Amino acid sequence: LVDIASKIQALFLLPPGIIIVTALLGFLIQIRWLLAGSFIVALSFAALLILSLPFTGQRLMADIESRISPLRLTDAADGGPAPGAIIILGGGRYTEAPEYGNRDSVSQVTLERIRYGAHLHRLTGLPILVSSGSPYGEQVPEAELMKTALESDFQVAVKWIESQSANTLENARYTKIMLAQAKVRRAYLVTHAFHMPRAVWSFENEGIHTIPAPMGFTTLNKEDRETLGYFPSASGLHLSSIALREHLGMLWYKLKHGKVKFSPATKPATAN
C-alpha cells in the first residue's frame, strides 16, 4: 500500500499530472487575478510544449545516463572480487496478456532487461538472479514471470528468484540475503541505463558490490535528431516523464538517506 501511495503521489508531481494541476490552478486564479492566472496557464502550456519535444526528453535522460558507462568485458579483473552472479531487476509486467491466454507476462521494459541478461550470461557463464515481487498484490510475482521468459524464450536457466521486493531498495535488501548464502561477493547488475545510478547506490548501500551492466540507453533516430525531435509528440512527453520520475527518485533518496551521490566518481569499478 505504501508503494501504491508513493506512485499516486508521483502522478501529481510529474507531467502531465503536474501540468494539468498547475493549469487548473491558473484557471481558478483567473477568477480573481486575471493577469496572474493567465500567466500560470500560459506557463503550464509552455512547459507541456517543451517537455513534449523528443529532444528535451533525450537531454533529460542524458543527464542521468551520462553518469554510467556501457559494460565492457575485456578485463573484469580490476582488483575487486570476481563477479559470481548476474542480477536482473524487473521493470513491470504485461497484465492478462490476451495472446498468452490472459496470463500475466513480462512487460516490454522487463523483456529488454532479461534479453540483455541472457546475452551477458552467454558471455560470462555466470548464474542469474531475477528480482521483483508483487507490489500490487498480484498472484504471480514478477520474478517468476522473468524466470519463465528466460527459460522458455532464451533457453537460459535461472538459479535464484527474489520475489519479495516492491521497489529498488527492496531489490537490494532481499537480494543481499540470497547472495550472502551463496557466498557471492560481487555481481553484474542489469537494468536500464536511466535506472542504473539509483540501483547501484541501493545495492552498494546494502554492501553488495556490483559491476553495472546498463542497457537501453536513450538514443534518437535520424528523423528525431534532424527535424522531428523539435516537434512536440506523445512519445517525447513520455520520455521526459520517465527522466523526471528518475530525477524525483534520486531526490527522494537524498532527502531520505542524507548524503547520496549519483555520479561516476561513486560508482563501482566497471570491467574494461
Placement of each model-derived feature along the sequence:
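Hydrophobic membrane-insertion alpha-helices, especially the h-region
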Residues: F39-P54
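Alpha-helical transmembrane segments of polytopic integral membrane proteins
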Residues: V21-T22, L53, G57, H257
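Extracytoplasmic/luminal low-complexity segments enriched in Pro/Gly and acidic/polar residues
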Residues: D224-F231, G236-N272
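A structural signal for short, hydrophobic/glycine-enriched beta-strand patches
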Residues: I50-S233, S240
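Membrane-embedded alpha-helical segments of integral membrane proteins
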Residues: L1-I29
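Membrane-interface helix-boundary motifs at transmembrane edges
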Residues: I29-G37
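Hydrophobic alpha-helical segments of integral membrane proteins
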Residues: L1-Q9, T56, L60-I64, L244-L251
